[in-house]
Swiss-Prot record:
One of its GO terms (molecular function) is aldehyde-lyase activity. Coiled coil: none annotated. It comes from Beijerinckia indica subsp. indica (strain ATCC 9039 / DSM 1715 / NCIMB 8712). One of its GO terms (biological process) is carbohydrate metabolic process. This is Probable phosphoketolase.
Length: 795
């Protein structure tokens, strides 16, 4: 491989021979410890002849990307010390965790947070033994890894996390290593455009480092195989000024890397000075690095006669030993090639002259407080949500757009935190569509690309972030939260599935971080899902899917929350509650269309705190046991349930009806399964032990059955919900198609009340006639029957 560096010209100072020697020594030490973690149970410094007893029985982990990460890390340490920089290290290829852990131990951070992994031979032994080992630590840059906010297991999110971390963090620079395999993912490909949303005056900076080692697990990488000029043009087209460092000779590569970083950080400083001192507002061309080095650099060049270094065979553990004991000598030679006797003291600690390369205190990347919930995270200032209460003289008296009311509350939160600058709202081009446009009274949408005269609400300093990529929005928000700030993401309900696997990763991070004593809590990941399944009659079947709730319901009960507020006042309370919470994933599903408002603010607060409860105004069983319970969860199911109750009160007044509304979905679960769950005694009191429960639910009915399957009366629950029936049609036809409408609910009541006798036949006939009338009317008029459109709860 040719050794060369090229890119924009800049200031560069050559490395002194002493500094070059110490940089290379640190790199060798990090590489040595990385290999030792992959292979060794004991004898970490080869003080004894290496035997099979010293080798782990199962070799788990990844070598290929690790030496490149170690190379980058030590050079960033040099620049941190020289310029006193605040740098957050993000490893897109998080499977290179042996390197991150090795550097953390060399910087002594690891021993500070895990005192048993001490700075001596005993600590080094524990460091090696624990890696990818039962009751040890994972193989990726998981929450157990000091300095990490990005596990890098599922690839694609490193760059969006990096930008999220530096928003409103003017002194922070995120050095983000992007693997060339990761660069092939959709989320990463989009996140290059995040530079159009960065304000050099207010935000920090991101230094993307594209690590081209040429191979994935078993294939070449696209960016590793296209011509260099094509790659350079691509990166310039994204708006970056790429600097290339390419080769495999360590001495030459150290010099080129130092030169490139000098140029890059001088460029960042120049851009920030121009924006912050001179007031330049044009979007700059930020520097970035392209490091082309061999996969498995410094490892065995061949194994069993097959090319390994610089090839995909170096991706994981380059060779096994248990089935090929002759490889033991190969491992010993490999480890000794780093000359550990020159690197470590007799005690096992790193030699002082090499250790002096590490920054001190919080300047160490492994000890950066930004990677642990942020530097002195500030609580969100939340004004009184009751100031936005919708006046409700009696149930259904007022009509309001719930999310529009929520938007006014979010506007006041944004205003209250203008000084702290620690709150942002994210969404994929849907903020106004989701009725949150009141935010634009106090801020605009972040935008740092070109402007035209007709543009509205675009500004480099805006705090509403919109890009048509759910992945990028969530990556930004996660990076923002993980560094100590607060936020909310709004999205069309059907399309939040795009980030299904992404929220999996965040849930796993939160679950694991709870068990790491030194990890600080972070603000919750809050979703507003609107433009939901029951009001996507205009966009059709492709926009109709409530299944994200089911996805979240699979997560740990101490993390996952799902709220289905039936009206605006309940939504205000739930929004306030979620924004005050920590270490949660909160999903709020609410409508944006004009809908009846049911509860005044005092009633809404009481109802939401309980999670579920009887709506007395809609019930007539106060003096006796109910004949039937009508349960509902979700705004449209609530509307249809109340219309069904109205029908029963009017036409079948002898039927005793209890109406129960559910806001907190997991209140349905037993207390033994979820902290918000109701006790069996209270649940039975509410839903009865033996009466039919006709349940109108926002999503897929099977979830309700799953949540309540251990309840006494489970077999009497008859759940109506989304049945995967949809089209471009009328709002009421959507619920009819899925048997969630008031008439199907009434029919189900009749079917489960034998006491109605012959009267049931006449009611069922009336219902059949009504369905036929409904179909004729919508086909003829293109809208719902007047009695549907104009129905109101009786005063």
């Amino acid at each position: 491989m040719d050794d060369r560096a090229h890119g924009p010209a800049g200031i560069s100072q050559p490395l002194s021979p002493d500094l070059l020697q110490r940089l290379n020594a640190w790199w060798r030490a990090a590489n040595y410890l990385s290999v030792a973690q992959l292979y060794l149970l004991d004898n970490p410094l080869l003080r004894q002849k290496l035997t099979l007893d010293h080798i782990k029985p199962r070799l788990l982990g990844h070598w290929g990307t690790t030496p490149g990460l170690n190379f980058i890390y030590v050079h960033l340490n040099r620049i941190i010390k020289e310029r006193d920089l605040d740098i957050l290290f993000i490893a897109g290829p998080g499977h290179g965790a042996p390197g991150l852990i090795a550097n953390s131990w060399l910087e002594k951070t690891y021993s500070e947070v895990y005192p048993a992994v001490s700075q001596d031979i005993e600590g080094m032994t524990r460091l090696c033994r624990q890696f990818s080992f039962p009751v040890g630590i994972p193989s990726h840059a998981a929450p157990e890894t000091p300095g990490s906010i990005h596990e890098g297991g599922e690839l694609g999110y490193s760059l969006s996390h990096a930008f999220g971390a530096v928003f409103d963090n003017p002194d922070l620079i995120a050095a983000c290593v992007i693997g060339d395999g990761e660069a092939e993912t959709g989320p990463l490909a989009t996140s290059w455009h995040a530079n159009k949303f960065l304000d050099a005056a207010r935000d920090g900076a991101v230094l993307p480092i594209l690590h081209l080692n040429g191979y994935k697990i078993a294939n070449p990488t696209v960016l590793g195989r296209i011509p260099s000029d094509e790659l350079e043009n691509l990166l310039q087209g994204y708006g970056y000024a790429p600097l290339f460092v390419e080769g495999d000779d360590p001495d030459i590569m150290h010099r080129h890397m130092a030169e490139a970083l000098n140029v890059a950080f001088a460029g960042i400083a120049k851009i920030q000075r121009a924006a912050r001192v001179e007031g330049h507002i044009e979007r700059p061309r930020w520097p970035m690095l392209v490091l082309r080095s061999p996969k498995g650099w410094t490892g065995p060049k061949t194994v069993d006669g097959l090319k390994t270094e610089g090839f995909w065979r170096a991706h994981q553990v380059p060779f096994t030993i248990a089935d090929k004991p002759e490889h033991l000598s190969l491992l010993e030679s490999w480890l000794k090639s780093y000359r550990p006797e020159e690197l470590f003291e007799e005690s096992g600690a790193l030699k002082p002259e090499i250790a002096s390369l590490a920054p001190s205190g919080e300047r160490r990347m492994s000890a950066n407080p930004q990677a642990n919930g942020g530097n002195l995270p500030r609580p969100l200032q939340i004004p009184d949500f009751t100031l936005h209460a919708v006046d409700v003289d009696y149930p259904g008296a007022r009509t309001a757009e719930a999310t529009f009311v929520m938007g006014q509350f979010l506007r006041d939160i944004m205003r209250a935190n203008e000084t702290n600058k620690n709150f942002r709202v994210f969404g994929p081009d849907e903020t106004a569509s989701n009725r949150l446009q009141a935010l634009y009274d106090v801020t605009d949408k972040t935008w740092n690309a070109a402007f035209i005269a007709e543009d509205e609400h675009l500004d480099p300093t805006g705090r509403v972030m919109e890009i048509l990529s759910e992945h990028t929005c969530q990556g930004w928000l996660e990076g923002y939260l993980l560094t100590g700030r607060h936020g909310l993401m709004s999205c069309y309900e059907a399309f939040i599935h795009i980030v299904d696997s992404m929220v999996n990763q965040h849930a796993k991070w939160l679950k694991t971080a709870r068990g790491v004593p030194w990890r600080r809590p972070i603000a919750s990941l809050n979703y507003l899902l609107t433009s939901h399944v029951w009001r996507q009659d205009h966009n059709g079947f492709s926009h109709q899917d409530p299944g994200f709730i089911d996805h979240i319901a699979n997560k740990k009960s101490d993390i996952a929350r799902v709220y289905l507020p039936p009206d605006a006042n309940c939504l205000l309370y739930i929004t306030d509650h979620c924004l005050r919470s920590w270490n949660r994933i909160n999903v709020i599903v609410a409508g944006k269309q004009p809908e009846p408002q049911w509860l005044d603010m005092e009633e809404a607060i009481s109802h939401c705190r309980a999670g579920l409860g009887i709506w007395s105004f809609a019930s007539n069983d106060q003096d006796s046991e109910p004949d039937v319970v009508l349960a509902c969860a979700g705004d449209v199911p609530t509307l249809e349930t109340l219309a069904a109750a109205d029908f029963l009160h009017t036409h079948l007044p002898e039927v005793k009806v209890r109406v129960v509304n559910i806001v907190d979905l997991f209140a349905l679960e037993p207390q033994t399964r979820h902290p918000h769950g109701w006790s069996d005694k209270d649940f039975d009191t509410l839903f009865t032990k033996d009466k039919p429960v006709i349940f109108a639910y926002h999503g897929y009915p099977s979830l309700i059955h799953r949540l309540i399957y251990k309840r006494t009366n489970h077999s009497n629950f008859h759940v109506h919900g989304y049945q995967e029936e949809g089209s471009t049609t009328t709002p009421f036809d959507m619920v009819v198609r899925n048997r969630l409408d008031r008439f199907h609910l009434v029919g189900d009541v009749v079917d489960h009340l034998p006491k109605l006798g012959a009267k049931a036949a006449y009611v069922k006939q009336w219902l059949r006639d009504k369905f036929a009338e409904h179909e004729r009317y919508i086909v003829a008029h293109g809208e719902d029957l007047p009695e549907i459109r104009h129905w109101r709860w009786p005063e």
